[in-house]
Amino acid sequence: MKCVDVIIPTYKPDQKFFQLLHRLDRQSLPPQKIIVINTGKEFFDEEAVDALHLQTPVEVHHIEVDEFDHGQTRNQAVKYSHAPYFICMTQDALPANQKLIEHLLAPMDEEVKLVYARQVPNQDAGHIERYTRQYNYPKKSQIKSEKTKAVYGIKNYFASNVCAAYERESFVEIGGFVPKTILNEDMLYAAALMKKGKKVCYCADAVVFHSHEYSGLRQLSRNFDIAVSQVQYKDIFAGLKSEKEGIRLVLGTARHLFKIGQAKEIPRLVYISGCKYLGFFMGKHYEKLPKWLVKKCSSNKKYWEKKDV
């Protein structure tokens, strides 16, 4: 039986986080411990965690709001783990069944050193978000490496740490997640792993409930940050175009909406897609924009306060 810890960064955790702890505690392969790295001690209710009476130990570490960094905060949490494997999750992802951890660790071998889960939409997700999850997380598992870039394009390095398992030895060898990055720390890690000759597995059998109904402006900000990351790491993303993948998703979503009799959703799809494209386009050219506009467009405003644009 493989020994594994679960790492969860939190910020103002709500009831879904406590459901997550409850479901992790009842896994067929339970974690050795759950490591919570929480931003803002005043927002965390440790008594509520104790009230769950979990069999799995929950270890909580607090950081200040201005200390949070997508990569570095997770790296810090990994240092509290001594298991040969660890799983990174977000506070709003819920295991769909008791086999999540078991399925996540099953593909690990001499070549596969990162396995990420399938995300299926929450019950309240709309038609557009449902199709987006279906598009990004198909029913068939995948093995990806440097040799599969021609097959998967920009998605070759896609390995969402909403729910993903990592092998400690290779993680330490690579140096962990890239610190002080605006976003995409999970993709950057997957790319570094592949460049070391290792492989990434998308495991469709490992399933979590996770989806968002983002507004157009939120989509703009998120895609702005994604594009900024791609500009800042040109050597990694060179030759891997996101635009074509985006067009395929939009056209596929439109066809799906017509097929299920939801053509009335097309205007919203056009609006959301336009916001995504505008954000991505602006992010690709962020170096030419005034600092106030860059900060306005970004969803990670703290990042720009610590950085000269």
Residue ranges of each PLM-predicted region?
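Acidic donor-binding loop at a coil-to-helix junction in glycosyltransferase catalytic cores
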Residues: 182-189
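Glycine-rich, basic loop-to-helix element that forms the pyrophosphate-binding segment
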Residues: 64-81
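Conserved donor NDP-sugar-binding/catalytic core segment of glycosyltransferases
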Residues: 98-130
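Short aromatic/hydrophobic "clamp" motif used to bind/position activated sugar donors
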Residues: 86
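A recurrent flexible, glycine/aromatic-enriched loop bordering the glycosyltransferase active site
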Residues: 146-166, 182
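Non-catalytic, C-terminal membrane-associated alpha-helical segments of glycosyltransferases
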Residues: 225-228, 232, 239-309
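A conserved acidic beta->alpha catalytic loop
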Residues: 38-48, 93-94
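Short, well-formed alpha-helical segments that are part of the catalytic scaffolds
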Residues: 13-26
